[in-house]
Amino acid sequence: MPAEQYKEHPLKLFGYCPRCGSNHFGINDFKSKKCGDCGFIFYFNPIAATVAVIVNEKNELLVARRAKEPAKGTLDLPGGFTDSFETAEEGVSREVTEETGLAVKETRYLFSLPNKYIYSGFEEHTMDLFFLCKVEGEALTPADDVEELRWIPMEDVVPEEFGLQSIGKGIEKLKTIYKTI
């Protein structure tokens, strides 16, 4: 991401070197800080997150309504952050089970989109990895940070109803390719 897209330095809240604890931790470039004492450079890189695209035999997309901020009350797709030592495929499968009660039996990578995600007042930059997921079972159980789950015919899905920017853009992209996935 070019430097001009940042409104302020992404590490402005980080005042101490994570390696040695020094407060001589200054801006190195548009996405990193460098310690003036030990020389450590800390880069601000995106966090991996996954998004599940689940389409049933009626060409309906499984959507969730967010129960928590950010974008509480808006539509979303199942998914979330990957855990350490977890593959993206394992992460999307775990998130689908946590949020819907469904078991994923197959995943296929579709595409990725960058996103900004506000968590506890801090702007996280994520790389959202979209996966087509085939699931077992039909009983939907909204849980974790999901208020409601429902199936919407793909042709009726409106990108603007999705609260997170990357999900809305992903829906736009899906609507152009969903007949081929």
Report residues per predicted region.
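Short linker/helix segments within small regulatory modules
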Residues: 26-32
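Active-site-adjacent beta-strand/loop module that shapes the phosphate/pyrophosphate-binding cleft
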Residues: 111-139
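Nudix hydrolase/Nudix homology domain
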Residues: 1-13, 139-181
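Conserved Nudix-box catalytic region and its N-terminal flanking loop in Nudix hydrolases
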Residues: 4-7, 56-98
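Short functional micro-motifs and their immediate structural scaffolds
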Residues: 25-26, 43
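Short cysteine-rich clusters marking metal-coordination/redox-active sites
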Residues: 17-20, 35-38
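Conserved N-terminal beta-strand and adjoining loop/helix that marks the start
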Residues: 37-61, 81
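Short metal-coordination and nucleic-acid-contact micro-motifs, chiefly zinc-binding Cys/His arrays
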Residues: 10-14, 31, 48
